[in-house]
Amino acid sequence: MRLAVLGAGAWGTALAIAWGQHHPVTLWCRSRALAQRIHTQRTNERYLAGPVLPPNVRVTDDCATAIGDAELVVIATPLAGLAQTVATLAQTAPHTPFLWACKGILPDTQELPHEIAARVWSETTAAALPDHGVITGPSFALEVAQGLPTAVVLASHNAQWAKAIIDTLHQPRFRLYAHHDVTGAEVGGAIKNVIAIAAGVAEGLGFGLNTRAALITRGLAEMGRLAEALGAERETLMGLAGMGDLILTCTGGLSRNRRLGLLLASGEPLSAALAALGHVAEGVPTTQACVQLANTLGIEMPIAQAVHELLFTPGTSAEAVVEKLLARDPKFEF
């Protein structure tokens, strides 16, 4: 299958490397200078240093060229770039099926990625929306690029199409599972970043593994409440897109959002912490969006609320937020 991967950050590069072992892949990079360096050096030193692009992968800074005759387009930009990339795809190849690999909720509109894609598509072209879906789950880019065993979910409203795609792209060390619950898969991929910030804060303050386990479990409950309120299935959150991604992001050393929490616990202001990361931390805008959604829908998300207060209320300390969270009244677990 001929693939176009749009976005040459860590995740886009990792997908190009993984699928480029067996399929022709064109990797689109917005920066001409970076595209030329990746093409020449066969590695992305800026975003994913070390892993080497296989011969099947070519690199370009021309998005239309990348899309070209692709049989499947994979959008691997940050969430903020999804709308523009979908619009380009709608104008360039309106009949080509596509996936997105970004996670989060748009703060301005509280839209999930599939809602952004559908809206932009209808605003851009009269053509019917082709088959599409999300790829998500517990997957650090570096480990995927290194060929370490990884399992993710491909969720689409067209489950038969999703199954056909995973039959083509599935590899022993990059396992794909089909799913029909797009909303549930996207909620899991979004909210786990918020909970990971909380887990990083707790770790940075010196709390133990009991605390981490409590945050993961109660974070899963918040994730499930939001997903159900949006029409998703709670069972989805018990799989790779929910619990799997939540565990990885709250515990893994490569987690940007967990590292952000560690920096905030040390007293770093948000702007300095984000600058120190050097990469996008989707948990920050997602925290803002999910709290707005929770308020609108009338559901309780106390961990997300606590993270929101730490991120967006000037002068709030990590210690104060934790004490407020721990002072909540006891209640039934379910």
Which residues fall in each region the model found?
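Internal alpha-helical scaffold of NAD(P)-dependent oxidoreductase catalytic cores
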Residues: 81, 92, 116, 123-131, ...
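NAD(P)+-binding Rossmann beta1-loop-alpha1 motif at the extreme N-terminus of oxidoreductases
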Residues: 1-51, 58-61, 88
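NAD(P)-dependent Rossmann-like dehydrogenase/reductase catalytic/cofactor-binding core
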Residues: 199-203, 228-238, 242, 246-334
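Rossmann-like NAD(P)(H) cofactor-binding subdomain of soluble oxidoreductases
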Residues: 53, 60-68, 72-147, 165
